Regions:
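Bacterial N-terminal signal peptides
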Residues: 5-17
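N-terminal amphipathic/hydrophobic interface segments
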Residues: 20-282
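N-terminal secretory signal peptides that target proteins for export/translocation
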Residues: 1-2
């Protein structure tokens, strides 16, 4: 099958330059120069002047430098600029979307990139972003906001680094400086928060996590479970690097509560807590 190829020297450069600038500093897409973009498709490429769009159908792919955007269909919306040239302001990618750079891969069912406002939204049943250090998975959407240097994962969202996992209804990731090499330096978790270490399961309503330090502060109906031991309170600190969990009393003075199940005669003795359980402070 002949694969159709089209090269946009100006409009394509605007598209990829916009995409790269907006995502490179947090999601890690490589920042490219002003070279042309090459669009390929198995079934055809259309230029619909009346609608001011370019359409690429069938295993469509747009590439420039180290950045590649793939999908069953790519739609590029353009408008005339002050110089009378066609300037692409929005890209829609539909079906089996895959965005890759030298060290990052993002996949989803659909994606919309608003170049004018610097907002990228990926949607679908399973959205996944893999960077050099981190993985983010979402079931509803993954949004990236250029000016705020922030990504929001919605729907049973999961952040993974090594064997550390943070799950919540919504995860908001804040990125540091450093261009393509930047990584997440803070994650806010809201709703049904769950943190897992090799030994503990911690549940809460909200959380604030520093991935580099491996430290998470959790608040709201906190429950720490390790084996048969459970501690309940309002606040907790979890070190996902060492696996240590520490339950703290609330600022209102509410006491920490612990549940320690009796051990068998071969264990620590009936009614005695395990010496490996999580710690609690009043």
């Amino acid at each position: 099958m002949m694969r159709l190829t089209l090269c946009f020297a100006l409009a394509g450069a605007i598209w990829i330059q916009g995409l790269s600038d907006s995502t490179a500093q947090s999601l890690g897409f490589s920042k490219q120069g002003d070279g042309p973009i090459q669009i390929e498709a198995d079934e055809g490429i259309e230029w619909q002047r009346a609608k001011q769009v370019y359409l690429a159908h069938g295993n469509a792919r747009a590439t420039q430098g180290g950045v590649s955007v793939e999908g069953d269909e790519l739609i590029a919306h353009y408008k005339p600029n002050a110089a009378g040239e066609n300037e692409i302001y929005r890209i829609n990618a539909n079906g089996n979307v895959r965005i890759t750079s030298e060290s990052e891969v993002a996949v989803s069912d659909n994606a919309v990139y608003d170049i004018d406002n610097g907002v990228l939204v990926m949607t679908g049943d399973t959205i996944r972003l893999d960077t050099a250090e981190d993985t983010i998975i979402a079931r509803e959407s993954l949004e990236y906001y250029e000016q705020q240097q922030m990504a929001i994962a919605r729907g049973d969202a999961l952040a993974i680094r090594d064997d550390r996992r943070l799950r919540a209804d919504t995860l908001t990731a804040h990125f540091g400086e450093g261009g393509r090499s930047a990584s997440m330096d803070r994650i806010e978790a809201n709703g049904n928060v769950l943190v897992s270490t090799p030994t503990d399961i911690v549940r809460a309503e909200q959380g604030d996590y520093n991935p580099d330090r491996g430290l998470a502060t959790l608040t709201g109906n906190v429950k720490i479970t390790r084996g048969d031991t459970q501690l309940n309170g309002d606040r907790a600190e979890v070190n996902l690097t060492t696996g240590e969990s520490r339950l703290l009393s609330s600022r209102s003075g509410e006491r920490v509560r612990g549940l320690f199940l009796p051990k068998s005669s071969s264990g620590n003795g009936a009614g005695q807590p395990s010496n490996t359980g999580p710690t609690g402070n009043q």
